[in-house]
């Protein structure tokens, strides 16, 4: 029997895939069953679902179970401090959208599918405690009955997220080398309630961004007409979560920097005090496995900052790539090693691109030269679709292009865009004959 620790979206999807390969699965989760109405916290966490995640859900045969919970976002709606707005489309094809989805609803839907499959045994309120690698067993605490149960690691797959206890256990036993790099910024979740009759108070087909240089606010739509907003801010310094330490400074800060958003936040002060500052950082580990006994997968192996909307998508892609290794019926240790060797260069690439995207979201999106390069990028894709696809589009809308390839081609394309826009202020200034020569010389067909 395969043991999976962590029944969030990644662990649930992995269990479904492996069950369909004929394996029996024991799925352990610290939290209560998400199908229980009491299990949902008062906070609403939104995730971005893009092409890679959708492809994985379709491979697993569960996309139709998730689709009703999805809200499409066609692009970014930039909110300037003077209350002006500007829409920046993500792509130029009807299918090039990103979906906002409630983490709780997504997890609930996946658990409902898993619960119906014979051979998947769900154990909620069961927390991983420790591993004994000499006896190839793990100790898991049954929180309802306050007792320890021992389960075999034959193998144990850890999908227990960025704070993975299994990763720390493997690291403590020097079976892997793991690190956590903390970003100087943190985040705080806030809310924008629905308007009268449940109407959306802002456009519901966009990701709303208030870029302000060293900090920003974003908001994603919810199915009930509300928005989940997230404030990203340095943890310490003159403008920071540390400095926003009383009702007056909080209100003044939001009213000054995000006036149109502040007017839509009647519960700002209560939420600001009640909600903790969240951790932002990058997790790295090498290797991801210990022999044939245990393997990390998803955020447990490679958590990233959330600024490319790829955390969950990357984890879901992990699941189908590991499933492809399992399909070969290799011994577990060999399957783990092959999966890690092929996957890690791609997860390293998206982790780096996610960090770069933070700078883009909070600073560059409001910059005229950046906006020109974005417009040119889409125009070059229209003219030369076999060779030029914007990096953002490669990551978000092309699951067939590995992250590493997107990163490498993206670097070349960035040089081309910089070269072509030097001295230009509009698309009419661009020499497209020269653009074609550069693209043909520097980019192979995709």
Question: Which stretches of residues belong to each language-model region?
Answer:
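Hydrophobic "anchor" residues on beta-strands that sit immediately upstream
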Residues: 2, 25, 121, 150, ...
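C-terminal helical "tail/cap" subdomain of flavin- and related membrane-associated enzymes
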Residues: 324-446
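Helix-loop-beta segment of a Rossmann-like dinucleotide-binding subdomain
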Residues: 84-101, 232-236
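N-terminal Rossmann-like dinucleotide/flavin-binding domain of flavoprotein oxidoreductases
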Residues: 55-59, 106-121
């Amino acid at each position: 029997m395969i043991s999976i620790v962590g029944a969030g979206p990644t662990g649930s999807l992995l269990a479904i895939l492996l069950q369909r390969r004929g394996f029996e699965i024991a799925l352990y989760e610290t939290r209560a069953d998400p199908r229980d109405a009491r299990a949902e916290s008062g906070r609403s966490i939104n995730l971005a679902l893009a092409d890679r995640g959708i492809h994985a859900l379709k491979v697993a045969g569960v996309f139709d179970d998730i689709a009703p919970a999805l809200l499409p976002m066609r692009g970014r709606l930039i909110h300037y401090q003077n209350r002006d707005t500007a829409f920046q489309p993500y792509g130029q094809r009807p299918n090039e959208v990103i979906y906002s989805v409630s983490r709780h609803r997504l997890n609930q839907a996946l658990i409902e599918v898993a619960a119906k499959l014979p051979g998947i045994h769900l154990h909620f309120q069961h927390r991983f405690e420790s591993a004994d690698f000499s006896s190839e067993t793990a100790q898991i605490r049954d929180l309802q009955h306050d007792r320890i149960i021992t389960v075999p690691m034959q193998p144990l797959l850890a999908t227990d997220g960025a704070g993975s206890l299994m990763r720390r256990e493997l690291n403590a036993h020097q079976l892997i080398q793991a690190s956590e790099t903390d970003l100087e910024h943190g985040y705080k979740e806030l809310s924008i309630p629905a308007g009268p009759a449940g109407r959306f108070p802002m456009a519901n087909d966009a990701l709303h961004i208030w870029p302000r240089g060293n900090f920003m606010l974003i908001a994603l739509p919810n199915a009930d007409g509300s928005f989940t907003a997230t404030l990203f801010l340095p943890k310490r310094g003159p403008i920071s979560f540390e400095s926003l330490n009383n009702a007056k400074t909080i209100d003044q800060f939001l009213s000054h920097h995000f006036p149109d958003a502040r007017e839509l936040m009647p519960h700002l002060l209560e939420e600001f005090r009640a909600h903790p500052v969240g951790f932002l950082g990058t997790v790295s580990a090498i290797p991801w496995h210990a022999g044939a006994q245990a393997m990390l997968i998803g955020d447990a192996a490679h958590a990233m900052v959330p600024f490319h909307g790829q955390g969950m998508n990357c984890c879901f892609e992990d699941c189908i790539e590991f499933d492809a290794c399992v399909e070969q019926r290799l011994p577990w240790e060999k399957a783990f090693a092959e999966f890690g060797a092929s996957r890690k260069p791609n997860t390293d690439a998206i982790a780096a691109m996610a960090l770069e995207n933070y700078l883009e979201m909070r600073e560059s999106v409001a910059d005229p030269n950046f906006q020109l390069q974005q417009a040119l990028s889409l125009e070059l894709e229209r003219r030369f679709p076999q060779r030029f696809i914007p990096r953002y589009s490669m990551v978000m809308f092309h699951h067939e292009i590995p992250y590493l390839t997107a990163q490498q081609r993206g670097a070349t394309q960035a040089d081309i865009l910089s070269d072509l826009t030097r001295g230009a202020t509009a698309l009419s200034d661009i020499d497209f004959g020269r653009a074609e020569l550069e693209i043909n010389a520097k980019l192979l067909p995709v």
